[in-house]
């Protein structure tokens, strides 16, 4: 039985867009063969199989705004990275973010309706599909933000902290992609699924189920730490956990939001050879 490492799971997550649990299970079933795992996930519909259909707006930008006691993230999409850097597109995206800041709690439907005329005009001018995809607000005593190249946006809410400290935590969230704030926040169903996977791994090595179940208890504590913010090694000082850094600072994190451009959207597979052949005919 091949060892299912964290780096292998991370690579599969990045390549398929599937969740951590699905990726671990697929790797176990494929005995650590990532290419086989991807094939199996595509067959079962877990992975987002690339399709040549439609004009998918999967590029774009993430914008962040901070108000009094809250923050907001907005994602606006277009078809190509080239247009994502266009002044007209960025101008509209910033208008949308400013409007969301000034109208706390606005729904995505209301936001889309507010800017539909401008969006349609810009689509006609540039010739690419684009849309306001999502908006999310985060309340907190203090809220910090971080944008990574306009492709990843994070908001972090905390107590007894300043925006600079929360920005550092937001940078960690951008890089390490935690799913929960604290280990105790990991839901029972997520823990149960992981336990079954770990038991299956132990049983594959020849251990009886009773022994395997006892073996995985220690692994479960490690797992809940890996998927939670406070349990992860702090990216700015890996010798300590985020939780230890916060404790030393006398601060606490209450919640966070992480957006990444295009996550969850099926991107059109580009056939480079066909594109080159088509260009030769022009």
UniProtKB/Swiss-Prot annotation:
Q: Which InterPro entries match?
A: EF-Ts_dimer_sf, Transl_elong_EFTs/EF1B, Transl_elong_EFTs/EF1B_dimer, Transl_elong_Ts_CS, UBA-like_sf
GO molecular-function term, one example from the UniProt record: translation elongation factor activity
Q: Give the domain of life.
A: Bacteria
Q: Which residues form a coiled coil?
A: none
- Keyword Cytoplasm on entry: yes
Instruction: State whether keyword Cytoplasm applies.
Output: yes
Its subcellular locations are: Cytoplasm
Indicate where this protein is primarily found: cytoplasm
Q: Which UniProt keywords apply?
A: Cytoplasm, Elongation factor, Protein biosynthesis
Read off the Pfam families from this record. Answer: EF_TS (PF00889)
Please tell me one Gene Ontology term that the record gives under cellular component: cytoplasm
Residue ranges of the region described as Involved in Mg(2+) ion dislocation from EF-Tu: 80-83
Which family is it part of? Belongs to the EF-Ts family.
Which HAMAP family does its entry note? EF_Ts
- Function per UniProt: Associates with the EF-Tu.GDP complex and induces the exchange of GDP to GTP. It remains bound to the aminoacyl-tRNA.EF-Tu.GTP complex up to the GTP hydrolysis stage on the ribosome.
The name of this protein is: Elongation factor Ts
Organism equals: Pasteurella multocida (strain Pm70)
List the gene name: tsf
């Amino acid at each position: 039985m091949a060892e299912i490492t964290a780096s292998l799971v991370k690579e599969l997550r990045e390549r398929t867009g599937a969740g951590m649990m699905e990726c671990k299970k697929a790797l176990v079933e494929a005995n650590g063969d990532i290419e086989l795992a991807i094939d199996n996930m595509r067959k079962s519909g877990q992975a987002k199989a690339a399709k040549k259909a439609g004009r998918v707006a999967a590029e774009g930008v993430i914008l962040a705004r901070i108000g009094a006691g809250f923050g907001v993230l907005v994602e606006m999409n277009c078809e190509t990275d080239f247009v994502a850097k266009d002044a007209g597109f960025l101008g509209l995206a910033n208008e949308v973010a400013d409007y969301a800041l000034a109208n706390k709690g606005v729904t995505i439907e209301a936001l889309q309706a507010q800017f539909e005329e401008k969006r349609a005009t810009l689509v006609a001018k540039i010739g690419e599909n684009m849309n306001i995809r999502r908006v999310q607000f985060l309340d907190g005593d203090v809220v910090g933000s971080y944008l990574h190249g306009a492709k990843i946006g994070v908001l972090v809410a905390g107590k007894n902290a300043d925006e600079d400290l929360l920005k550092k935590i937001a940078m960690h969230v951008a890089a390490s992609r935690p799913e929960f704030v604290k280990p105790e926040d990991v839901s029972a169903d997520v823990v149960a699924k992981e336990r079954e996977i770990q038991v299956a791994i132990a049983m594959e090595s020849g251990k009886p189920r009773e022994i395997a179940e006892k073996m995985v208890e220690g692994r479960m504590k490690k797992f809940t730490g890996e998927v939670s913010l406070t349990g992860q090694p702090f990216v700015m000082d890996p010798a300590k956990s985020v939780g230890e850094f916060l404790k030393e600072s006398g601060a606490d994190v209450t919640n966070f939001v992480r957006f990444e451009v295009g996550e969850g959207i099926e991107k059109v597979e580009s056939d480079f050879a066909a594109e080159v052949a088509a260009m030769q005919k022009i």
